[in-house]
């Protein structure tokens, strides 16, 4: 898919393949109190509009993202970075890759739900131009916890020829 140079080394972003599942499950388990199971990942990824991508650094899976394509939006379903690779621009590179798929007249926004107690994720996405647009009461099946609905909107004027797209809210 793409390679992005960062401060420490190259981040390579590519489509997720079956042999990535063990690494993805390990990252999921280290990142969430209620992680998805392998069956949940497989069931999701078998759907026509559900896509998985991974970020590699030094040929090691450093993070993953599962997202769903809708007519006017992209919905991030699961996203996590291995603890050893956090705060090293891996997550930012993955979100930037997803933003590059937006277009003014087609899919023009990215949405996701973030647990109300997951302040690091809220701050990460806010820093990248996402805004909380609503509260989803008792959203999760595993707890009565609420979720913030966060959204990034594509703005055509934020695109500069020859430069990467800029984030806009």
Where does each model-flagged region fall?
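Short secondary-structure capping/turn micro-motifs that flank functional sites
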Residues: 44-45, 118-119, 141-142
């Amino acid at each position: 898919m793409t390679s992005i140079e960062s401060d420490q080394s190259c981040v390579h972003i590519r489509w997720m393949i079956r042999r990535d599942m063990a690494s993805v499950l390990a990252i999921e388990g280290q990142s969430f109190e209620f992680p998805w199971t392998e069956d949940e990942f497989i069931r999701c990824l078998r759907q026509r509009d559900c896509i998985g991508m991974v970020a590699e650094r030094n040929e090691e899976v450093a993070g993953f993202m599962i997202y769903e394509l809708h007519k006017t939006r992209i919905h991030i379903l699961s996203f996590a970075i291995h603890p050893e690779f956090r705060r090293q621009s891996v997550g930012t590179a993955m979100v930037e890759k997803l933003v590059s798929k937006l277009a003014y007249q087609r899919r023009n926004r990215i949405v996701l739900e973030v647990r109300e107690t997951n302040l690091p994720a809220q701050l990460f996405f806010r820093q990248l131009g996402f805004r909380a647009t609503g509260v989803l009461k008792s959203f999760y099946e595993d707890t009565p916890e609420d979720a913030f609905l966060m959204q990034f909107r594509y703005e055509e004027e934020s695109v500069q020829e020859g430069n990467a797209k800029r984030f806009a809210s």
